[in-house]
Amino acid sequence: NNANLVAPFTNNSQYAEDVIDSLYPLEQLYAEGTSMNVSIDVMTDTLKRAGEKTDGSVVVFFISDGEITNEENLKSFKSAAKYVDGGAVLGYGTTEGGNMYMKSSYTGQDELIEDTSSYPRKPAVSVIDEDNLKSIADDMDVKYINMNDASNIDTTINKIKRESASESKDGKVSGYA
């Protein structure tokens, strides 16, 4: 598995939403387990370049279930922290786990993803690992929010907006993505 930058740095919030809507899981034929470690270098480099290109704040939302299934241990995300002005780690899933689905490129319908590491194949299950997610949040000095109880997200976003808003000469606020 590897990490790829799928969109350039932007302050266009509609573009950011469109990119998020276009994300999809790795084709199960090529999947080799999951690990957040593959994202560290790409993320750190992108955050560094973002800080060099703007006078505004660099905000990160790291969205994951936190699960590592490829036998690795979680590495430190501290290398990214010096480039982060705000954000949050958003954790999704439950400790009981849930079946994983992906949209079929043939039918457009959601299909159950299978765990190909066993025979007969079983449904692939996503299980939240809050210890990993909290560790990433601590490393980047941002808040961890379990999205099963998302009551803190509005407060966090409003705080980020207050702390990262920038005004142009004509008084317009910009810089949210």
Give, region by region, the residue ranges found by the protein language model:
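Membrane-embedded segments
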Residues: N1-K48
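Solvent-exposed coil/turn segments that connect beta secondary-structure elements
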Residues: N2-A3, D21, P25, D65-G66, ...
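Soluble non-cytosolic domains of exported or imported proteins
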Residues: T10, Y30-N37, P123-D131, M147
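Sec-exported extracytoplasmic/periplasmic mature domains
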Residues: D21, P25, T44-E52, D138-D141, ...
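A short acidic, often aromatic-flanked loop/helix-cap motif at beta-alpha or helix-coil junctions
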Residues: T34, E96-G97, A150-T155
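VWA/integrin I-like adhesion module and closely mimicked acidic/polar interface patches used
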Residues: V59, G66-N132
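Extended, hydrophilic extramembrane loops/domains of integral membrane proteins
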Residues: E130-S164
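C-terminal signal-anchor/stop-transfer transmembrane helix together with its immediate cytosolic
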Residues: A165-A177
